[in-house]
Curated annotation (Swiss-Prot):
Homomultimer. Binds to single-stranded and double-stranded viral DNA. Interacts (via nuclear localization signals) with host importin alpha-1a. A motif (Nuclear export signal) lies at residues 96-117. This is Capsid protein. It is found in: Virion; Host nucleus.
Amino acid sequence: MVKRDAPWRLMAGTSKVSRSANFSPREGMGPKFNKAAAWVNRPMYRKPRIYRTMRGPDIPKGCEGPCKVQSYEQRHDISHLGKVMCISDVTRGNGITHRVGKRFCVKSVYILGKIWMDENIKLKNHTNSVMFWLVRDRRPYGTPMDFGQVFNMFDNEPSTATIKNDLRDRYQVMHRFYAKVTGGQYASNEQALVRRFWKVNNHVVYNHQEAGKYENHTENALLLYMACTHASNPVYATLKIRIYFYDSITN
């Protein structure tokens, strides 16, 4: 039941002093209680069940934070025969760049850098396309297979490369792209920028070893294959490859 206002509330020049009033000189400095903010940031046990069972889109299913990162910075000499590197090499440890246990999930891959030619090659009149394949190896063993062992090509041309039929159950091309450079005296484009960001959600499994090597993978290794289309003029790629991953709950 609502109380009526006291008569002195209606009298001019007078006011009732509230018991909850704060006359401290630091009153304006402290944080004020916001009812709406407290409701939004309420603890998980006071939320409905769907909030406890559903996970945000940032964290993959079966994983937990924080989001960790591993970088691979290297200059690559890319030839017509192709090159491969493993980008899921993560050492076991306690840091922000290490995995906690055997299992983790690579949420996304970020590739940035440039493709360029040296002083002798860029003077020749030619066009060279550098092609990249992000491949998932479902059953890694030993050392990474070479470009020619994994891909089937017509007339040894990397632009026609597809996974061999007997390896399609093991290797899966997740993404592919290319960058083009042109040499010559006039209409030359001696370097090309590379910038790609992919969401992959690849669950990697290691064995009991701590070292981050391809030979210690047991499931779902991430490989980056590179090859150029020109047979006699190689190119260089200065790349910084970053993977963002989460540790698995089952570790």
